[in-house]
From Swiss-Prot:
NCBIfam families: PRK00218.1-2, PRK00218.1-6. PANTHER family: HIGH FREQUENCY LYSOGENIZATION PROTEIN HFLD (PTHR38100:SF1). SUPFAM superfamilies: YcfC-like (SSF101322). It is a peripheral membrane protein. It comes from Xanthomonas euvesicatoria pv. vesicatoria (strain 85-10). The lineage of its organism: Bacteria, Pseudomonadati, Pseudomonadota, Gammaproteobacteria, Lysobacterales. It comes from the Bacteria. One of its GO terms (cellular component) is plasma membrane. It holds the Pfam family DUF489. Belongs to the HflD family. The keyword Zinc does not apply. Its main location: cytoplasm. Gene3D superfamilies: HflD-like (1.10.3890.10). This is High frequency lysogenization protein HflD homolog.
Length: 204
């Protein structure tokens, strides 16, 4: 299979991995620090030379790749996650066609990147707040709206909401990369076997 399919599944794993954290935070109020950092780093690495470089390494995407592995074999335990992923992949189309929103997001990411550099942590709460606010002011106004359900106790906390929105921004970033690598929703119908093989290669 072509390298492009290998690259596509890495980007798709980035989408799944970020959204898994969204689901986790919404339900429990807690996230996995290393996974969140991988997601935030991917937002800032806009000029990376390869999909692997966007996430630091293919190994950093192991949780997302396992999610894809289970999904393709009908072993996924979270029925909501695929629906969230589909909404994000559809939202990406609206986003990239809205040049004004793209420019605003790019400027906001640049500002947040400087903030992260000053703080020495891409997943610092202040950085998450900045990126979450950026998502709320821009992409969240596009359709389809990504609806996140969870425990009302946690969804009422500003820090939790900011982290969820920052991760949704990261998911959209991965969706953009997926499309840049040639990804298309038709892949799920007509290239499923190739996707499964690419996921298996990435997990070896």
């Amino acid at each position: 299979m072509s390298v492009s399919m290998d690259h596509r599944v890495l980007a798709l794993a980035g989408v799944a991995q970020a959204l898994q954290q969204v689901r986790r935070i919404a339900e429990t109020g807690h996230s996995e620090a290393a996974t969140v950092r991988t997601a935030m780093d991917s937002v800032f690495r806009v000029d990376a030379a390869s999909p692997e470089a966007v996430y630091g390494s293919a190994a950093a995407l192991a949780p997302g790749l396992r999610l894809l592995h289970n999904y393709f074999r009908n072993q996924g335990q979270d029925e909501v996650l695929p629906r969230l992923a589909l909404a994000v992949l559809q939202l990406e189309r609206r986003f990239v066609r809205d040049t004004s929103t793209v420019a605003t997001v790019a400027s906001g990411i640049d500002a947040a990147a400087r903030q992260a550099q000053q703080l020495g942590d891409s997943s610092h709460p202040d950085v998450l707040s900045s990126l979450g606010g950026l998502y709320a002011q821009t992409i969240s106004h596009l359709r389809p709206k990504v609806m996140v359900q969870g425990n009302p106790h946690y969804l009422g906390q500003a820090g939790v909401v900011a982290e969820i929105r920052a991760l949704l921004l990261a998911a959209v970033r991965s969706a953009v990369l997926w499309r840049q690598m040639g990804g298309n929703l038709w892949d799920f119908l007509f290239a499923k076997r190739a996707m499964i093989e690419a996921v298996d290669r990435a997990l070896r």
